[in-house]
Design a protein with these regions (language model features):
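Bacterial Sec-dependent N-terminal signal peptides
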Residues: 1-36
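Carbohydrate-active catalytic/glycan-binding domains of CAZyme proteins
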Residues: 7, 32-300
Length: 300
């Protein structure tokens, strides 16, 4: 199975793709033409059940009760400011239904007017059954970063913004972020340059920073586990320009972490993308890590 997709981003275009970690092979245009109902290819937009372009950027996918839910930034070409986070659902990762804007712009605060909201990630907390959403908030000059969180009783319901995400009494004031949920239900917050925080039992705060500054200069963090080994993906910092992304491995989330090099052939520039998420696709008795990457362009 190979899946890939295109979406629009900010003032710019945003291409995401889902690739099997084991092969990294892209779907050809001819195979797309033969399987238009089930495969979405790079280079063309997605359309939802309403015939509109899927607007979900910096995205993640969550599987819940046999259905897939795509969360992302709902973007406008008119402004870079936060508009809302969108949710789409699918039973085949190909045909998507627009659910709603699950978290709209707030009247004030971290996600109020003239603020940034990016890299939304959602996990279901196993101890409470609650759905917890995480995001990078900021001002429009990226000078006031803070990780925020929101909660909902249903995966596609209205999320209530709870404010800054903290360790102890201190907000975590960082930029690029991601999340990872281990097979035992433990949740983790991932930060650019390689900080890893273990979440509290209710996922509402961080209880401990396990790793600090693993990858200086790294951003767009994502993690997955395969056959007992943990993989941590990063991109280099090259502003809007694409680069060859790389990875670390470890026998445990707390380390020790060892740099493993590039995870796509050198010079391919991660298929012109930047890491955003790795979705654990359940396939029979196996779980297949599926890479999701953003393709950036600026200003349009």
């Amino acid at each position: 199975m190979n899946l890939s997709f295109l979406m629009e981003k900010r003032h710019s275009y945003f291409i995401s793709m889902i690739l099997l970690w084991t092969s990294f092979s892209l779907v050809s245009q001819s195979s797309c033409a033969q399987n238009q109902e089930k495969i979405i290819c790079n280079g063309i937009p997605w359309f939802d059940d309403q015939g509109k372009i899927v607007n979900a950027h910096g995205a993640c996918i969550v599987e819940d009760a046999g259905r897939y839910y795509l969360f992302g930034e709902y973007r406008s070409d008119e402004t870079n400011s936060f508009v809302g986070f969108s949710c789409y659902s699918s039973d085949d990762l190909s045909n998507w239904k627009f659910e709603r804007i699950v978290l709209p712009i707030q009247k004030e605060g971290l996600l109020g007017p003239n603020r940034i909201g990016e890299r939304v990630k959602v996990m279901k907390c196993p101890s409470t059954g609650e759905y917890v959403m995480y995001m990078h908030t900021d001002d429009t000059k990226y000078c006031d970063p803070c990780i925020g969180y929101a909660t909902s009783k249903t995966i596609n319901g209205e999320y209530i913004f709870q404010g800054p995400f903290k360790i102890g009494n201190e907000p975590i004031r960082m930029w690029d972020m991601g999340t990872f949920q281990d097979t035992d239900g433990t949740g983790y917050l991932l930060i650019h340059e390689g900080d890893i925080y273990r979440l509290s039992e209710d996922y509402h705060s961080a209880e401990k920073r396990l790793v600090k500054n693993m990858a200086p200069g790294g951003e767009s963090p994502a993690m997955f586990k395969k056959e007992g080994i943990y993989y941590f993906l990063f991109s280099n910092k090259t502003s809007w320009e694409k680069n060859d992304n790389y990875y670390f491995t470890a026998p445990a989330v707390g380390g020790p972490w060892k740099k493993g090099g590039l995870f796509v052939p050198e010079g391919k520039l991660t298929y012109n993308s930047q890491t955003t998420f790795v979705f654990p696709l359940t396939h029979g008795k196996d779980t297949i890590p599926m890479f999701m990457g953003d393709r950036w362009s600026f200003p349009h």
